[in-house]
């Protein structure tokens, strides 16, 4: 049992190393944006969080700055008010999958789609807005996500 776990972890580590050193394998998702030269995008992952999200929103409000929040579907439960607040304050919201599965790159195409759609549907139900942004967990994906 222990040897199986070690082998499995080594395979995962190898997968990430290959992705880092051979970017042309398209393991990392391509970023498509329309940022003008001299601008930056502020993004926040893994929310909403009862402690950190309000602090971030307060700072952004203080300086009249907008950001993009990539939310995890399972974190939205009991935090719907924060999702609504993010949206009402003019920030963008994107999906960061439902469960933030560490093995996301190894999931089937169907399971990946479900992870993304489930979160998109929850966010749309709360905000009324269609979700167009997606960030895979750990920034890593596979050929099924383009």
Residue ranges and their predicted role:
Residues 1, 52-53, 144:
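Serine/threonine-rich low-complexity intrinsically disordered regions
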């Amino acid at each position: 049992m222990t040897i199986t776990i070690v082998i499995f972890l080594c395979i995962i580590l190898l997968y990430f190393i290959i992705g880092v050193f051979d970017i042309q394998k398209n393991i990392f998702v391509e970023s498509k944006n329309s940022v003008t030269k001299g601008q930056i995008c502020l993004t926040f992952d893994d929310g909403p969080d009862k402690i950190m999200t309000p602090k971030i929103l307060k700072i952004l409000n203080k300086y009249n700055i907008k950001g993009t929040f990539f939310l995890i579907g399972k974190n939205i439960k009991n935090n719907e008010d924060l999702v609504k607040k993010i949206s009402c304050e003019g920030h963008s919201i994107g999906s960061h999958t439902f469960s933030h599965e560490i093995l996301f790159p190894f999931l089937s195409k169907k399971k990946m789609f479900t992870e993304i759609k489930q979160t998109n549907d929850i966010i749309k139900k709360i905000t009324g807005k269609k979700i167009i942004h997606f960030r895979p967990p750990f920034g890593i994906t596979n050929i099924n996500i383009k």
